[in-house]
Amino acid sequence: MFALTNSEIVARCPQVFQTNYSKARTKKYGQYTTAQVIDALRTEGYEVTNAFSQARTPGQFSKHCVRLSHRDFLDTLHPDETRPEIVIVNSHDGSSSFRIMAGIFRLVCSNGLIIADEQTADNRICHWKGNSFDSVINTALLVAEQAKESYELIDQMKAQNLTPQQQKDYATKAAQIRLAYNKKSQVNFAENLLVPHRHEDNITPSIWNTYNVVQENCIKGGQLVGSRVLRPLTNISQNVEVNRKLWNEATALLA
């Protein structure tokens, strides 16, 4: 995958280059623009690979998500066609902190995973003037290293297979996470979550393969839920939380 230029980022997510913030904020508000962070991380070798927002209207302060990867991984992927990433969520409407998380991008399904465990914490930096810009960048670089270190855990997930019942139990928990608002449809939805979209995800019933199949189905949607087709999970906050919970449930299966 190629790095996005600034013009390509603007076309996808103009909020990244928003330099103002909501006038409802107090004088204590300290703004860390997403564009500033991107520029600083580019000097460290990182490039934007994806950017999207919950609102497409230029000039708004809405929440947006940016994923970055080191240039070394843009040319040479991990043997299983994945790469570690920095995931940034930000807004300038005062509704949230600057959020930095570790992620994994899987090329085969163009899907972004978010890692969640004790070692790869969810870093939230408040927008207030007491926090330095350097602390944001240092946190992002630390998260990038944590994403690389997560491959040891991924290798363990690949090495351990699940029984059919364990797969069903994981899918059931995933359905409860994704359809927390619709308990009646969770049972049928759980069965659909285990349907793979590609042959390589069905070779072995490993934790890693099971997790990837379920995660992709939860995020991308397309399954019949009641009388409706489930839509992709585009809400950034919900996407992040579902992703993190699915990861936690998957790693909990490790013996």
Question: Which residues does each predicted region cover?
Answer:
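N-terminal low-complexity, intrinsically disordered segments
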Residues: M1-H64, R71
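Intrinsically disordered, low-complexity regions enriched in serine/threonine
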Residues: D72-A255
